[in-house]
Amino acid sequence: MTPATREPQQAANEETAPSIRAAAAMTRRGRSFTKDNVVKAMFIVPAAIYIILFFGYPVVKNLLMSVQEYTTKTFFTGEAPFVGIENYLTVVNSNLFWPSIVNTALFTIGSIAGQFVIGLALAVFFKRRFPLSGFLRAMLLLPWLLPLIVASATWRSILDKDSGILNQFLTGIGLDAVPWLTSPSVALTAVIIVNIWIGIPFNVTILYGGLQDIPDELYEAGSLDGATGWKAFWHITVPNLRPVVSVVLVLGVVYTLKVLDIILGLTNGGPANATQTLAIRSYQESFVNFEFGVGAAFSNILIVISLVFAVIYLRANRRAVDE
Amino acid sequence: MRHRRYLTVLAAAAVVPIALSGCSGGSSGSSGDPDTLTILDYYNNEPDKTLVQEALDTCAADLGVTIDRESVPGKDLIQKVLQRSSSKTLPDVLMLDNPDVQEIAATGGLSPLSNYDVDTEGFADGIIEAATYEGELFGLAPAVNTLGLFYNVDLLEEAGIDPPETWAELKDAAAALTDGDQYGIAFSAIATYEGAWQFLPFMWTNGGDETDLDTPEVQEALQLWVDLVDDGSASNSVLNWSQADVKDQFAAGKAAMMVNGPWQIPALNETDISWDSVQVPVNEAAQTPVAPLGGEVWTVPETGDKDKQAKAAEFVECISSDDNQLALSESRYLVPTRTALAEEFVEKMPEMASFTEQVANARSRTGQLGEDWPEAATVIYNAIQLAITGKAPVDEAFSQASEG
């Protein structure tokens, strides 16, 4: 669940606490607390409506679509015959299913590893104050501010084999030109590189915030005991940053699993299906082939995978609270 | 207190979308005014937007109706049409890309033109085929496009090469014209329907057919593309080039020839490249070049309002009238669909001669397979990608691609 939906519930809980006390006070005087119950319910209603409308309905609809033969005809006639698990069988038996699972895994692991390592390095770097550090840190947010479609179009021209600036640079320093987006063996790497670039601001921002929360006294005390440099990083920074790290990683995984626009903009799943992921398969089945049922089946598989990570996140969080 | 205000805002925010969705239904779709026709198309870029508007205004004045036009980006049109058909708010007049007509007609969302008194005589066979589903004609196109071979006149003259007419000549010319960072030829082999569309002239001209892709004729066409890339006469970036990218390469002087359509002519005329075009080369001298037909068809959706549908049918007929065909073809570099207009048109627009000839023999993509065409197109572009990347040999590419 995203932070945006958790907040209202928390707010509602905090809000009801005083009214429970008021209710208890009223019970002593008489049994007229129905109005109070209504008030309590009213606090939940907005959040409930929001969740049912914008989370519940799409999820249920998607589950339904995945067991129906849902095609272009359905939109006009409203008829979508029930086909059971046939769509799921189509998905699992398609030649692209396992390659797209592998690609999704490689894409996610590669992106997260790159984003996190570079993000953490930059966050630690910017913890020191130096001239222009504030300005440079703001500039780091730039990839986040660009519309993804613009970013992918720009990267597409940068990575172009013949006239792309990256290959011009590589041949300039005496290396061979790399067919970034046209060779099945490097295209996935190229797409991961671009996604790392896009994900760095998110990682830097959250990790930088986490670093700010580590009290300076710890480092001062550590340095008296001889913990400086790498030692300070391993024994003070890393343990204190752990809760933030788990947030960054889990959210990162969930965001990366569903990446669509960057891949569509860069390679459209090609060359020779080398960059097909579950998200791309789902999009192409639904909006290119108009097999909405099969597309829904693909996206449900994706949702289940995301859900696993969401559960890991929630459990890790609960453990942190218990501790 | 702070929390309470926050919640009030949240409650209000939760109600807003519900309120909004409540009133959005009435504003679009067939409007209540009997003399207003709603129109949906995908000409959302200039100059096409204005040029088409002129044609629509002419017809609106002729029929004494007012029009309420909406233009959406091309890739969003089908989604928009599907949304509107489920909410029963289809427009009175709907433009569709010709390979989509049968798919939409199959949903039952379009009204056959035989219900109305519409003159459908004299149109090129290909475009009638594209707009026909189960024996009924569902729309008319005023003007169409196709593919041809553009060449850079200066570069060919310098090298002393005549525009190629056969595949062998094409390969030789492309090899001879490749020099440094200039490639002999550019085409689009991208993993979308665009890649399949660009392959069709070679496949069809050689006698290949989309009903059976595992034939020597189709494989020979694929071999030609693979050879062009393997020889280095075409960049392997063709795998990721859209037709617009191909035009950019040609316009930048990085490709001496390109496979492309006449809709690129306005952009080419803005560059200082001197270009000309010929029909797509054939494998053997006796063959006739057969290219795919592109362009948009105007249809009458089933809106439930019989009087308006009749008016919309008149409107569709008017868009495809002789005068409109010529006007649109001239301004947008298309080819009129009434074959009788060809001669007059080429006289006025000599640069469109090869495309006009190409259109006369052109085929529609959905002529044979109808609503199953997208599936075949997917197999075609996947096979092209497999073969050019070397992931599969040419003779196995199609069977491998068809396995999904």
Regions found by a protein language model. Give the residues of each.
Chain B
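Conserved N-terminal structural module of periplasmic/extracytoplasmic solute-binding proteins
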Residues: R2-V16, L20-E103, E284-A286, D307, ...
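C-terminal capping/gating helix-and-loop segments adjacent to ligand/active sites or protein-protein/ligand interfaces
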Residues: T132, L334-V335, S354-E403
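Extracytoplasmic/periplasmic substrate-recognition and gating elements
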Residues: D57-T58, A159, D230-A234, N269-S331, ...
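A structural signal for short loop-to-beta-strand junctions that line the ligand-binding cleft
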Residues: Q83-R84, P91-D92, T120-D154, Q287-V290, ...
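Hinge/lid segment of periplasmic solute-binding proteins
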Residues: N98-T146, K171, D179-D181, G195-Q198, ...
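Periplasmic solute-binding protein
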Residues: I104-G109, I127-P163, S188-E210, L293-P301, ...
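Glycine-centered hinge/linker elements that transmit conformational signals in sensory
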Residues: A174-T178, T211-L239
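Extracytoplasmic "Venus flytrap"/periplasmic binding protein-like
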Residues: A55-D125, T132, E157-E165, A256-M257, ...
